[in-house]
Amino acid sequence: MNATPASADDLIVIGKIYSVHGVRGEVKVYSFTDPIGNLLDYKTWTLRREGSVDKQVELVSGRLQSKFLVTKLKGLDDREEARLLSGYEICVPRNLFPDLDDGEYYWYQLEGLKVIDQLGQLLGKIDHLLETGSNDVMVVKPCAGSLDDRERLLPYTEQCVLAIDMAAGEMKVDWDADF
């Protein structure tokens, strides 16, 4: 494992190591990719945990097991050494992500956008998104200049999202501010 050469701003979290698997140094991983197996397409990971130095690791193999992945990392052959990686986020440089069609966005691109209703009122900024099964949900938290100090949950649907202006850092929504 090496110190990572990638810039911290360039890295996007795509998963998290949450425990060990077996006695040979394999780790269980929650994947944030869709489908979850896409995480295995990235062979070099930067592992990050608050208060620790980033580590660069190489993926040797991985397999789907229920709702998580079991992965083998190069040079990690011991259960106790693998246990030390629990809690690390798995990051990759954003330039490795596939290009999307027009009108499609990665979640990290939406986070931080100002959310403005049809009346021009600032509802807040997108803090993060949740996957609910039926549709994704944006968690909109108040920010400087917000209409009020309420947190809102807005569906990421065509009916709600009217327009996204990445250059302006804004999303226009069809949403009643009283909700």
Swiss-Prot record:
> Which GO biological-process labels does this protein carry?
ribosomal small subunit biogenesis; rRNA processing
Q: Where in the cell is it found?
A: Cytoplasm
The Swiss-Prot or TrEMBL record annotates one GO molecular function as: ribosome binding
The domain of life for this entry's organism is Bacteria
Q: Does the keyword Cytoplasm apply?
A: yes
Pfam name, any one:
PRC_RimM
Q: Which residues form the PRC barrel domain?
A: 102-179
Question: Where mainly found?
Answer: cytoplasm
UniProt keyword list: Chaperone, Cytoplasm, Ribosome biogenesis, rRNA processing
Q: Which GO terms describe its cellular component?
A: cytoplasm; ribosome
Sum up the protein's function in the record's words: An accessory protein needed during the final step in the assembly of 30S ribosomal subunit, possibly for assembly of the head region. Essential for efficient processing of 16S rRNA. May be needed both before and after RbfA during the maturation of 16S rRNA. It has affinity for free ribosomal 30S subunits but not for 70S ribosomes.
The record's listing under PANTHER family reads: RIBOSOME MATURATION FACTOR RIMM
Complex and partners:
Binds ribosomal protein uS19.
Domain-related comment: The PRC barrel domain binds ribosomal protein uS19.
The record's similarity note reads:
Belongs to the RimM family.
| Name of the molecule in the record | Ribosome maturation factor RimM
Query: What taxonomic classification does the UniProt entry list for its organism?
Result: Bacteria, Pseudomonadati, Pseudomonadota, Gammaproteobacteria, Pseudomonadales
Gene from which the chain derives: rimM
